[in-house]
């Protein structure tokens, strides 16, 4: 779905992406969002010293992995370039049909350079740039309040490119440790939405309140790992037999019971290009 990029083109070989950014895209302080913001943000995300656990999301990009590992030091060799203020060119190692899905992940979002540098070095962790009053973002909401273990409040961002269509004035997020407590609060109308439901409540919602339960596809695969260095699982034939014997339908129906889909391949079925 187009957001800060209004459109994009993909080369015939699937290795080059050209993103066209909206001219009216703004940071929450009014600064324009530019292609260079993405270049700098991805440079920061790949800094070895930052220790970004999601750096691998960018590894399909030419030389991104080598840069993150410190094998090369010249970021100009990494396949991301700002052709002008509103045009971003990304070159991949191979055709990666799910690359656009990777860009849905928050680790690929641009960050505001001036704000980060005002509170420390780009690769420094734990600085105050994310605190209320400091944080500058480019989404539909801005951070207003963050009280640890109490509440996070965000308010509508007047500089958002599509602010006219943002219907909510704000959102309150309540951290709740106990999933049963959270479900009761949702049922009582104290919460408008929850992403966590006790397993034993899912069947009840499906039966009595199906309109209040929505199961989204998740780009991930759950699996059980075995020690294949010890007998009998060191025998490939035994592993193949176990694979054939497992009733995946029964596992998701009677064990996990969370709306999972039986996995017959390691790649999730909703992966683009699969």
Question: What feature does the model see in each segment?
Answer:
Residues 7-8, 77-79:
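Beta-strand-rich interaction surfaces with strong enrichment in secreted/lumenal proteins
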């Amino acid at each position: 779905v187009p957001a800060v990029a209004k459109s994009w083109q993909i080369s015939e070989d699937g290795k080059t992406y050209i993103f066209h950014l909206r001219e009216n895209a703004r940071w929450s302080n009014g600064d324009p969002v530019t292609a260079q913001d993405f270049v700098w943000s991805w440079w920061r995300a790949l800094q070895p010293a930052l220790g970004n656990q999601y750096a691998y999301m960018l590894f399909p990009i030419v030389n991104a992995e080598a840069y993150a590992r410190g094998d090369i030091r010249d970021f100009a060799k990494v396949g991301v370039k700002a052709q002008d203020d509103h045009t971003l060119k990304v070159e991949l190692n191979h055709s990666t049909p799910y690359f656009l899905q990777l860009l849905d992940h928050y680790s690929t979002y641009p960050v505001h350079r001036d704000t980060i540098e005002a509170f420390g070095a780009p690769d420094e962790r734990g600085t105050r740039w994310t605190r209320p009053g400091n944080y500058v973002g480019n989404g539909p909401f801005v951070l207003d309040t963050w009280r640890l273990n109490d509440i996070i409040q965000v308010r509508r961002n007047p500089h958002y490119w599509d602010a006219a269509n943002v219907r909510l004035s704000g959102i309150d997020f309540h951290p709740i440790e106990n999933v049963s407590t959270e479900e009761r609060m949702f049922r009582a109308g104290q919460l408008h939405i929850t992403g966590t439901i006790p397993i034993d409540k899912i069947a009840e919602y499906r039966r009595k309140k199906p309109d209040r339960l929505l199961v989204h596809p998740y780009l991930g695969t759950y699996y059980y790992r075995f020690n294949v260095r010890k007998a009998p699982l060191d025998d490939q034939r035994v592993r193949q037999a176990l694979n054939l014997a497992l009733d995946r339908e029964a596992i998701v129906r009677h064990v996990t019971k969370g709306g999972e889909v039986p996995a017959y391949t390691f790649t999730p079925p909703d992966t683009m290009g699969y």
